[in-house]
UniProtKB/Swiss-Prot annotation:
It comes from Staphylococcus saprophyticus subsp. saprophyticus (strain ATCC 15305 / DSM 20229 / NCIMB 8711 / NCTC 7292 / S-41). Keywords: ATP-binding, Cytoplasm, Kinase, Magnesium, Metal-binding, Nucleotide-binding, Transferase. It comes from the Bacteria. GO terms for biological process: acetate metabolic process; acetyl-CoA biosynthetic process. It catalyses: acetate + ATP = acetyl phosphate + ADP. This is Acetate kinase. The gene is ackA. Its EC number is 2.7.2.1. Homodimer. The active site is at D147 (proton donor/acceptor). Mg(2+) binds at N9, E384.
Length: 399
C-alpha cells in the first residue's frame, strides 16, 4: 500500500518540501517557502506541472507549515493532513550521536540542539522546522535524516586528525563529512544501474555543486570523504577555500589586520572560485569567462578540477582500486567541461571515457565511459528527498 511521505529541508528563513508517494518514489508536489520572518515572504508550489507562486507575510516556521498544509488541501493534493503518513527532516549534523536516521522524540530534539555548536548555521534552523511540524502534525511519525550519518562508517584512521588525541575525546574534533544523503543515494542508484550488489562495488562519488565533496564508498559504506569537521575542508568550492595550510590563518590575520572570525569568513565566503577568479562563484560564469580568454577564470577552473582529480586518485588508492566513478549535483550533472578536466589522464587506472558522450550529457542519467572501460563513469542526478523518504519508509511502522 502506498504511503505519502513529506521530505523537509528547513533553513533559517526558508522551507523546502516534497511530498512523495512511496515506495513508487513519485513526486506528488514540491515547493519552497522563502523569506520566512520577513515581509513579502514567497510561497511556491508545483501541482500537476503548474508552478503557483504567492506572496504573504509569514512570521515564522509554524505559520509557514500551516500555509503549506492549507495549500495541499486547497489544490487537492490531500483531503486531510492525516493522508500524510510520515515526515523526514534533513538535519545537517548528527555528530557521533546519530550513525543513522532516528525517530524524533523530545530527547532527540535536545540531542540535535546539543550538536548546534558543530553546525551553528544549520542545526538550529533544522530544529525550527522540526518543532513546527511536530506541533502541527503530532500524530504523524517524524524522522531525522542526518547529512553526517552516512560517513559514520569511516574508520578511525580516516576520520581522526593528527592532533592531540584528547582533543577528539574532549571536544569531538574529527572529520565528520557532509552530503551523506546524496552520496548514499547515488551509490545505491549506481548499483541498481549496473545490476550488481552494492557490497561488491568500490565507488567514488563526486558531489559537485557550489559546495562540493568527494566520498570513497567501499561495499556501500563510506570509508573516507573530503569535507571535514566542517564543510569548509576538502576540494575548492564556489566560495570556500577547501584545504589550506592552517598556519595561513594567523599569517593572514597579521598581514590584513583581520581577526580569526573575519579570516574564517573570508575562507568560507570570499575564496574558492570567487577568490581566484575575482568575479564569480558560479561555475557557469567561470566557464564563460574562460572561453573568452580570461586567465584568472581559466586558472580558477583548473584549480577546481585539479583538486577533485587528486581526490579520485587518492581514494582509488584508499580502496585498492575503483569500479565506478559517479558525478552528481549541479556542476557534476551539468558541466561536461569540469567532468572532462577531472577525468583527463585517468586511463592509467582503467578509466576510458567518451568525450563526445560526455559533451552531450547535461542533467540526465547516463554512462560516459566507453563500453570496454574497466572503470564505469556515470552521471546520476542526485535525489536527497527520495533518500530521506526511503529512510522514513524503512522504519516500517507508519500508520
Amino acid at each position: 500500500m502506498s504511503k505519502l511521505i513529506l521530505a523537509i529541508n528547513a533553513g533559517s528563513s526558508s522551507l523546502k518540501f516534497q511530498l512523495i508517494e512511496m515506495p513508487e518514489e513519485k513526486i506528488v508536489t514540491k515547493g519552497l517557502i522563502e523569506r520566512i520572518g520577513l515581509k513579502d515572504s514567497v510561497f511556491t508550489i508545483e501541482v500537476n506541472g503548474d508552478k503557483i507562486k504567492e506572496t504573504n507575510d509569514i512570521a515564522d516556521h509554524e505559520e509557514a507549515v500551516n500555509i503549506m498544509l492549507d495549500s495541499f488541501k486547497k489544490h487537492g493534493v490531500i483531503d486531510s493532513i492525516y493522508d500524510i503518513n510520515g515526515t523526514g527532516h534533513r538535519v545537517v549534523h548528527g555528530g557521533e550521536l546519530f550513525p543513522e536516521s532516528v525517530y524524533i522524540t523530545d530527547e532527540v530534539e535536545k540531542q540535535i540542539e546539543s550538536l548546534s555548536e558543530l553546525a551553528p548555521l544549520h542545526n538550529p534552523a533544522n530544529l525550527m522546522g522540526i518543532r513546527a511540524f511536530r506541533k502541527l502534525l503530532p500524530e504523524i511519525p517524524h524522522v531525522a535524516v542526518f547529512d553526517t550519518s552516512f560517513h559514520q562508517t569511516m574508520p578511525e584512521k580516516s576520520f581522526l586528525y593528527s592532533l592531540p588525541y584528547q582533543y577528539y575525546k574532549d571536544y569531538g574534533i574529527r572529520k565528520y563529512g557532509f552530503h551523506g544523503t546524496s552520496h548514499k543515494y547515488v551509490s545505491q542508484r549506481a548499483a541498481d544501474i549496473l545490476g550488481k550488489p552494492i557490497e561488491e562495488l568500490r565507488l567514488i562519488s563526486c558531489h559537485i555543486g557550489n559546495g562540493a565533496s568527494i566520498a570513497a564508498i567501499d561495499g556501500g559504506e563510506s570509508v573516507d570523504t573530503s569535507m571535514g569537521f566542517t564543510p569548509l575542508a576538502g576540494v575548492t568550492m564556489g566560495t570556500r577555500s577547501g584545504n589550506i595550510d592552517p598556519a595561513l590563518i594567523p599569517f593572514i590575520m597579521e598581514k590584513t589586520g583581520k581577526n580569526a572570525e573575519e579570516v574564517l569568513n573570508t575562507l568560507n565566503k570570499e575564496s574558492g572560485l570567487l577568490g581566484i577568479s575575482g568575479t564569480s562563484s558560479d561555475l557557469r560564469d567561470i566557464q564563460g569567462e574562460a572561453e573568452e580568454g580570461k586567465d584568472r577564470a581559466q586558472l580558477a577552473l583548473d584549480v577546481f578540477a585539479s583538486r577533485i582529480h587528486k581526490y579520485i586518485g587518492s581514494y582509488a588508492t584508499r580502496m585498492h582500486g575503483v569500479d565506478v566513478i559517479v558525478f552528481t549535483a549541479g556542476v557534476g550533472e551539468n558541466s561536461d567541461v569540469v567532468r572532462a578536466k577531472v577525468l583527463e589522464g585517468l586511463e592509467f587506472m582503467g578509466v576510458y571515457w567518451d568525450a563526445k558522450k560526455n559533451e552531450s550529457i547535461h542533467g540526465e542519467e547516463a554512462f560516459i565511459n566507453y563500453p570496454h572501460s574497466p572503470v564505469k563513469v556515470i552521471v546520476i542526478p542526485t535525489n536527497e528527498e527520495v533518500m530521506i523518504a526511503r529512510d522514513v519508509i524503512n522504519f516500517g511502522d507508519l500508520k
